[in-house]
Amino acid sequence: MINDIFNILLPHFVLGGFIILLLVLSMVLSPRLYRYARIIAVVGISASVVCLSTVQTDPQYFGFRNSIMSDSYTLLFDFMILCCGFLVALLSKNLVKRHKRNAFTYFAILLTAIFGAINIVSANDFLTLLVSIELLGFSTYFLISVSKGYHSKEAAFKYLITSAVSTGIFLFGVSYLYGITGSLNFTTIYEYITQNETSLIYTISAIMIILGLASKLAVFPFANWVIDVYKGTETSVLAYLSTIPKLAMFGIICRLMVFPLSNSFEIVFVIAVLSLLTALWANTYAIREKNVKVILACSSSANASYALLTASLVSVYNLSTVIFYLICYVIMNIGVFAYLNMYGDEKSFDINAFKGIYHKNHGHTALYTILIIGLAGIPITSGFIAKIYLFTAIANSGLVFVPFLLGLLLLMVLALFYYLKILMPLFYECDKNTDAEKFNTNFSQKFVVGVSAIITVLLGVCPEMLIELCRFIAYNI
């Protein structure tokens, strides 16, 4: 038991300790000391990152009766989740300043969400996975509802309902799989599947499990919630929502597609159809939208669909491509929401409200432009390299997937229109009488936007080292 704690769970225990500390302080400290909440959260996440060095990864380590595991794959995803959590905590300065009474509670919930996310990636049975998903889901629900406005409460309620339905579908799939194999452990299920012929009920259960998990990625037909949630949520929470849950869900989906869910054509074909439908819905919806948050919600859904299709086509090359794509995506996304955090949550997010902002905020808007063109997949950014590798992986997976590839390519070209729609108003109205205001920024916002933009360009120019690391991790999963 002690070996399990030090070989796998020390980062989890450290994070859990800081969660308890924040909850205790929320009851005993005055709201006037709200500034210390962010400091404690940042220290807790940093300590957890340091403790990752104690995690055993070679060979794979299984603990607590094989219910959790660690390897280089889980270590990378844990590191990415914790880094995103660190940046989200930095961006939450203005939010907790407006909600001083709930500052300690807010950061306790944020750390709980991170705790749930890293447990999802480490899970090696469906019971541990379910508890971790619910921990992440309920924490996300409270983070969405942190604002006092009507739209925030509506967004949280819609997320809760969608999450409940998707969890039900996931549980049905797990129950069918348990009925077939007699186990909830990934390793045992994988051994059973490889030694026996798969049946129709197995295929149905696998599709239900993947669909239940993919709903958190806003995949069709559970995609509509993302519109209302993004529209009614604070930008610092959106920086969390667009990164940490997605990393956690892709982390476990990729592992499940390797084992215990064998790579059957029926499962992959259904995922391919859902991915294409998601991309079609997201890109066509975004074209007619004028709210920047909604456009980014659709962008998030579309980008997730590209990665989901590639993740289902199991191979070392494809898996490494998905990992590289996710790293590039979360860096760009968190930078974009850091810029919107500079802009201010109390302002209108209609694209026309951004007119002329470049002329009052040259440097910040230039960095924001780099991040948006990265999301669009334009050259000299990591987004371009990531999408090239992603679509190459799909093309190499067989002729049957070429129509899906062509469809996704056409939709990606279509997506350029709404990315340009975000950028063009920024450079309008060059006269000095423009209504645009100079941002009142803090160091945390500048740091996140600057670092995100720099990494986006660096990975676009020289991605080789990161790609090699991703291939090494994919090979050793």
What positions do the PLM features span?
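Alpha-helical transmembrane segments of multi-pass membrane proteins predominantly involved
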Residues: 1-477
